[in-house]
Amino acid sequence: MSTIPTSGHIPVMLAEVLEMLCPRDGATYLDGTFGGGGYARAILGAARCTLWAIDRDPAAIRRGQALQAELRDAEGGMRLHMLQGGFGDMQGLLAESGVHSLDGVVLDLGVSSFQLDEVERGFSFRTDGPLDMRMGDTGPTAADIVNTMGESDLADIIYEYGEERMSRRVARAIVAARAQAPITTTFQLADIIRSVVPGDRSGIDPATRSFQGIRIHVNDELGQIVTGLEQALALLAPGGRLVVVSFHSLEDRLVKQALNRAAGRMPGPSRHDPRSMRAEQAAPDFRLLTSRALRPGETECRANPRARSARLRAAERLAVPDTQNSTHNNTSPQERRP
């Protein structure tokens, strides 16, 4: 095990991620969401491996470059390589550097703790900052969206991505408020939402779901997940593993569906769905390492409340397609511990 400089950033479910990824010497891995570098440090510390890391946030790239410098000082070599961009573009980004196959991929979905804590990024309604919400430094901001989007479209993204039942009411209030003055800060938007969405016994701030919906739209987060999962699975060599940590039901649903498809665990044929009545399906190339999503323990949740909603799923590319676990045989493959 290597000695890697430590960081104050504590990634969610780190022990479980490492157990599922099972880093080994000489292998090549990808951290598709570098963020604070917590997973990257742990992977590099667990084995003498090479790690490529992607993030679209310039601040994350700077943190990665600082870690590169620390590693050079500590080891005299270069095992960490940083790439700026979205993980949904991982194949193209890696191909430009001559990388076409990986032994493992880790994805930590959603907004990072650093982004939430940096007031000027405009992700949080708990502090007043500019209404930005971009994970990168290009594209429309949240302020652009809430001040220009039509009421119906605004309601749709808040409902679909934020799962806010009162989305129509929220959109109407936003449109009425912006007619008086532009909405430019997180406090402004949060107050508008709270004026029409009552609190409930859960203690969740009434602005939470609407902020989530707008943020997901601004960053095309679900689109990134769909393409990122597809590309990650395609890049994995036999024995390669994909480990994904998600934080809300929309993310977890996409991950579950993608991994189940890869492992051949799709619903059986139905006479009500002609598309399902196919005579034969190709043997799956993957097996699930998690029959259901893993969740953080209570100790971790007490130490880091943001971990409470985390879900981890993982899969491994098989050396030989599994002819015993076709689409028409939905028996779960026996889990093996890494």
Curated annotation (Swiss-Prot):
Chief location: cytoplasm
Q: Where is this region: Disordered?
A: 261-284, 299-338
**What reaction gets catalysed by this protein?**
cytidine(1402) in 16S rRNA + S-adenosyl-L-methionine = N(4)-methylcytidine(1402) in 16S rRNA + S-adenosyl-L-homocysteine + H(+)
| InterPro entries assigned | RsmH, SAM-dep_MeTrfase_MraW_recog, SAM-dependent_MTases_sf
Q: Which GO terms describe its biological process?
A: rRNA base methylation
PANTHER family with a match to the protein in the record: 12S RRNA N4-METHYLCYTIDINE METHYLTRANSFERASE (PTHR11265:SF0), S-ADENOSYL-METHYLTRANSFERASE MRAW (PTHR11265)
Query: Which UniProt keywords are listed?
Result: Cytoplasm, Methyltransferase, rRNA processing, S-adenosyl-L-methionine, Transferase
**Molecular function as annotated in GO:** rRNA (cytosine-N4-)-methyltransferase activity
Q: What is this protein called?
A: Ribosomal RNA small subunit methyltransferase H
Q: Which gene encodes it?
A: rsmH
Q: Compositionally biased, Polar residues: which spans?
A: 322-338
* Function field: Specifically methylates the N4 position of cytidine in position 1402 (C1402) of 16S rRNA.
Q: EC no.?
A: 2.1.1.199
Binding residues for S-adenosyl-L-methionine: G37, G38, Y39, D55, F87, D108, Q115
The UniProt entry's sequence similarity note says:
Belongs to the methyltransferase superfamily. RsmH family.
Transferase in keyword set? yes
Q: Where in the cell is it found?
A: Cytoplasm
Specify the domain of life of the species encoding this protein: Bacteria
Q: Which GO terms describe its cellular component?
A: cytoplasm
The record, for Gene3D superfamilies, names:
Putative methyltransferase TM0872, insert domain, Vaccinia Virus protein VP39
